[in-house]
């Protein structure tokens, strides 16, 4: 309990319970929303009623409350409920604020008679944030005017397990009456903030984070496709995903139809011929940046009861929102644009609560948990997501046009160009075309390698979506173990280059590319 030395009403001292105090030093807001009322406490302090009016906080009261919450509520889930209750509530005049009645709650944080409500930490309302830029900065971290703790930045919670005050509290948690965490593999407060942030950007009900994009893809496929089931996917995709679909899923009796991204007749035929459980594709795809008509595919698949999952890694939630277009799930390698700094590996799946919880259940069994320190780094990276993506989009578009006009480049693959086979689709369902440009150099493997080696700014490396520009020859970086004939089956030519444009100044990149082309 916290006692204010300056709250006297009719000569009666007022006792402030920690649960009910708002982190609001100017005392301009309500203390508690109506839904967070408690019951079961009828005691009085030294004869004074627990329902007196609160007048004002001492100057250092907020800081003391923050410390007391962490000391008294050693269960982090409870502490977040407490912190959320301090911060929540609409702005009100001081006259209205003075009149708010604050019920007293046992400061030990384990009153078994307390009505438990879901923490707004796990069910935040970001409706006052109207743009992707604001959501990327604040979603998941803002609770009304405040935040989940008194810190501006979300803290990293490094723990493998979470305690319960009593057995009764544990039972309440198991039966859904008490919001908290149990074991590190099942959830973490820092990771939860990141999940809420991604959900807000994707307009999803729920998101689950995993240790990598491949982890997210494989767990999703195993969770949603039954043994003996059938999936439809596309020819152009990340090679490791294709390997899993073609070599691992058959061991579970799962078969696949592999189609060109634009082959809608083939999709209709597969839906008629098979009981398709899932349609899964990237859009744009890797490395040719093909774009699937998400709205049309979703209508066709839903008519036959199939789930649609779109890998939107190349697009980002800023450039494309697959769920409003009709997809059921969207998966990302958060390693790429979402984290955006080439320093963390992660994956995520967003969609309806029902489907995501099905995936989450298997994820809890298999593991592949994202470290909370990595989650924090992604949260930090996402605060500049919209700014980075704008720069990626602009630089890539300008580079694609430059390359398409250059005599030493035979073909450019970029959905923002009218020459791209799905430009009309990309223009309809994307607000930007991303930061990756693939192209073919006029020459063989060695000529192309000479061009790549002559570049001074981009790093020769795998991955994409970071601040630094990265370039590679897929024939060498991703398909070197296959013969040229086998590579050709996937459209991978020796002169193909995948260029991930970073956030460097375009003029520097332009001059670098031109001098490298001059060298061949």
For each predicted feature, which ranges?
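Conserved N-terminal alpha-helix of the aminotransferase class I/II PLP-enzyme fold
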Residues: 2, 14-38, 44-113, 156, ...
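Mobile, glycine-enriched helix-loop/loop "lid" segments at the mouths of ligand-binding/catalytic clefts
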Residues: 126-130, 136, 140-181, 354-357, ...
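Well-ordered alpha/beta subsegment
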Residues: 203-204, 230, 494, 502-517
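Conserved PLP-enzyme active-site core in the AAT-like
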Residues: 2-14, 107-128, 133, 138-148, ...
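Hydrophobic side chains in well-ordered alpha-helices
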Residues: 194, 359, 447-451, 509-513
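Conserved C-terminal alpha-helix-loop-beta "cap" of PLP-dependent enzymes
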Residues: 14-52, 56, 145, 408-497, ...
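Short amphipathic alpha-helical segments
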Residues: 179, 205, 345, 374, ...
């Amino acid at each position: 309990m916290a006692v204010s030395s300056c709250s006297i009403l009719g000569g009666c001292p007022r006792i402030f319970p920690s649960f009910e105090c708002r982190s609001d030093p100017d005392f301009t807001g309500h203390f508690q929303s109506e839904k967070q009322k408690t019951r079961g406490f009828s005691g009085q302090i030294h004869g004074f009623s627990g329902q007196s009016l609160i007048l004002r906080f001492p100057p250092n009261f907020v800081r003391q409350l923050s410390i007391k919450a962490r000391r008294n509520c050693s269960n982090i889930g409870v502490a977040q409920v407490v912190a959320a209750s301090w911060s929540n509530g609409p702005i009100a005049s001081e006259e209205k604020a003075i009149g708010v009645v604050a019920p007293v709650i046992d400061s030990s944080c384990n009153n078994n008679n307390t009505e438990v409500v879901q923490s707004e930490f796990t069910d935040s309302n970001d409706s006052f944030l109207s743009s992707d830029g604001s959501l990327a900065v604040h979603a998941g971290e803002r609770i009304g005017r405040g935040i989940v703790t008194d810190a501006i930045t979300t803290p990293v919670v490094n723990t493998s397990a979470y305690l319960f005050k009593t057995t009764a509290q544990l039972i309440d948690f198991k039966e859904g009456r008490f919001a908290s965490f149990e074991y590190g593999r099942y959830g973490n407060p820092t990771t939860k903030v990141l999940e809420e942030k991604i959900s807000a950007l994707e307009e999803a009900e729920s998101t689950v984070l995993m240790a990598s994009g491949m982890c997210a893809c494989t767990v999703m496929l195993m969770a949603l496709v039954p043994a003996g089931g059938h999936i439809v996917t596309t020819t152009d995709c990340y090679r490791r995903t294709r390997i899993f679909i073609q070599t691992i899923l058959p061991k579970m009796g799962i078969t696949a139809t592999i189609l060109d991204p634009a082959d809608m007749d083939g999709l209709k035929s597969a839906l008629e011929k098979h009981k398709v459980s899932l349609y899964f594709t990237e859009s744009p795809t890797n490395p040719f940046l093909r774009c699937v008509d998400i709205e049309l595919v979703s209508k066709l698949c839903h008519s036959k009861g199939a789930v649609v999952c779109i890998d939107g890694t190349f697009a980002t939630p800023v450039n494309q929102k697959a769920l409003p277009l009709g997809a059921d799930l969207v998966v990302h390698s958060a390693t790429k644009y979402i984290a955006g700094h080439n320093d963390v590996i992660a994956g995520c799946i967003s969609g309806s609560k029902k489907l995501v919880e099905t995936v989450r259940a298997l994820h809890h069994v298999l593991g592949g948990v994202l470290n909370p320190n990595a989650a924090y780094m992604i949260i930090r990276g996402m605060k500049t997501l919209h700014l980075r993506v704008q720069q990626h989009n602009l630089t890539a578009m300008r580079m694609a046009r430059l390359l398409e006009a250059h005599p030493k480049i035979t073909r450019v693959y970029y959905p923002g160009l009218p020459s791209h086979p799905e430009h009309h689709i990309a223009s309809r369902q994307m607000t930007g075309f991303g930061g990756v440009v693939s192209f073919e150099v006029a020459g063989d493997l060695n000529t192309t390698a000479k061009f790549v080696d002559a570049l001074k700014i981009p790093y020769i490396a795998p991955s994409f979506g970071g601040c630094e520009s990265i370039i590679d020859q897929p024939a060498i970086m991703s398909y070197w173990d296959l013969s040229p004939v086998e590579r050709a089956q996937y459209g991978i030519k020796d002169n193909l280059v995948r260029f991930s444009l970073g956030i460097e100044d375009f003029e520097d990149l332009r001059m670098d590319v031109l001098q490298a082309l001059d060298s061949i």
